[in-house]
Regions:
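C-terminal terminal-subdomain/extension
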Residues: 1-26, 91-146
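Compact nucleic-acid interaction/catalytic patches
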Residues: 56-99
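Short alpha-helix capping/helix-loop boundary micro-motifs
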Residues: 29-36
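Short acidic, S/G/P-rich loop/turn micro-motifs used as interaction or catalytic elements
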Residues: 53
């Protein structure tokens, strides 16, 4: 998608409406947490707006592997499409299924982060990873040296 002034204005308006809704609900009930309309579980991949970051960091929208659901937050590993060449030592290629189509995706362990559930794009379907959550957690632990 091309970044234009109109696209950015639409994205900003959308984020503003989400914040207004979130704070209204939070004032009504302090224990309330945002629950996305998309049903997913740990081990699925969801499309997440990672926002604008520093150079050399992933930003904007990416499919992310959900490692851990922590009420209002998620521990995720962002992914990219598989380009030519082998993955680096901090990347891993996995097979995924989106709407019945099988493809490859490259998990980038060095970009692992905790994000708010409000960053999930519920208009996009979830992707199913053909790799077990236990194996991904093992590889993540191996990457961080645990």
């Amino acid at each position: 998608m091309e970044v234009t002034k109109e696209n950015l204005e639409v994205a900003l308006d959308h984020l503003k409406s989400q914040w207004v809704y979130y704070w209204k609900k939070k004032k009504e009930n302090p224990k309330w947490g945002y629950i996305p309309t998309l049903e997913f579980q740990e081990g699925d991949m969801v499309y997440i707006n990672l926002d604008v970051n520093f150079p050399h960091e992933m930003c904007f929208g990416h499919w992310c592997y959900v490692v851990k659901d922590m009420e209002g937050k998620l521990l995720v590993i962002p992914s990219t499409s598989v380009k030519d060449g082998c993955p680096c030592k901090y990347e891993m290629d996995i097979n995924v299924t989106l709407d019945g189509r099988k493809m490859k995706s490259r998990l980038n362990f060095s970009e692992t982060r905790v994000i708010d559930k409000m960053r999930i794009d519920c208009k996009k379907p979830k992707m199913k990873a053909e790799c077990s959550l236990v194996f991904i957690k093992y590889k993540l632990k191996e990457f961080i040296g645990g």
